Amino acid sequence: MGCWAIGGPFWFGEIAAGYSGADDAESLRALHAAWDHGTRVFDTSAVYGAGHSERLLGEALAHRGDAVIVSKFGHSIDATTRQLTGPRFDPAYVRWSVEQSLRRVDRDYIDVMLLHLNDLPVEDAEPAFETLEALVAAGVIGSYGWSTDFPASAAAMAHRLGFSTVQHSMNLFFDAPSMCRLATERGMTQLIRSPLGMGVLTGKFDDGRYVPGGDVRAGPADWQGYFDGGRPRADLARQMTAVRELLTVGGRTPAQGALCWLLAKGPDILPIPGAKSAAQAAENAGAMAFGPLPETVMHEIENLLQRPPEGPPRAR
């Protein structure tokens, strides 16, 4: 389960970087529902709600020792104003950030720690990964990886013993064949962020509803890619309309169909859909019972979408 949304608001200047409408009581119910329906991987970050997402995870999973917690570092944030204050990835900060995350999730061990700077140059990232390697040796984290959409960045670190995971954007709108191929060749787990296109692929915006201000999706489309001024991008809305019926094959909801599209892409792909309610968490987890979309449906979707060539990598 992706835990960006439950963290609530945080900001980059005047631009919202978090989700609106999060309610702590319902967020806790969502986390419990996810667990009860078979979810075992929970993805968060030190910046989600200025650490609030991690604290909620710590509370909800206090007696769930086999829960897999993935967290991220790389941005400094003012906890009082919830303002992002800039990238930080020097070794001392990496250690400090991991310590703070451990306190917030109330554990002495985090399963996977990811660098949360998508397009950081490889040479600048090296010291951070050296530090993470030392933290693996110290038993503080289980392994580490990079949240990046750049295959070359992941490839540059894949030789490291503790580098286990690449988190990247991928969904029915934006395929990522180069990253998938690399991850499979190198034996890396793929954590898929934005598997539901920040909500567009749930179908709940098909009736014209929009996201209010104070939400990351109400910001400029060139920053988050799926919404323009609080409404789904017109081209994505058209694509959603075109494939909606195919996604619901076998009794799936549109959201479950979109997740099953990802499951059909390979056994090393692990979508991390977000949820702000228990109902959403249960629905998302229900995709596991359906399993991958049938091959014939996958072909029909590709024929309808007529994707352009992948093109050069870019941050998504």
Per-region residue spans from a language model:
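Conserved, mostly hydrophobic/aromatic
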Residues: M1, S27, F42, L57, ...
